[in-house]
Amino acid sequence: MFMLQIADYIAENYRGKVVEVGIGRFTAVAELLARRGFEVFATDVVERRAPEGCRFYVDDVTKPNLKIYEGASLIYSLRPPPELFSAIVEVSRKVGADCLIKPLYGDYMEARIVNYKGAQFYLIRRENYD
């Protein structure tokens, strides 16, 4: 399943604080990263159970509380709706974090595609923001 590969990719390439946008009910990546020593923040527009080892915040990425995201090395989202892609990238740009988006099959955005151990996702590095 792609979630393990994405957790491995993040663990191999990032340190410290990471933020998952729109965590929903699929908390495996956040929980795996927390177990690996990451400071994991998770957000959603509705109240959710905080994944083990994570901090949860109700936040709307289209009207974000930037304090939640500040200091993150990576902001990532797993299968967000395409209408949120630009908001996720914009929050990442504003706080100087890399941005990783794993879209639903067939969703497209203008960004570099990474194929890591069979998991495909978009990655925008902080140095590539306009």
UniProtKB/Swiss-Prot annotation:
Transmembrane segments: none annotated. It comes from the Archaea. SUPFAM superfamilies: S-adenosyl-L-methionine-dependent methyltransferases. Pfam families: UPF0146. Belongs to the UPF0146 family. This is UPF0146 protein AF_0739.1.
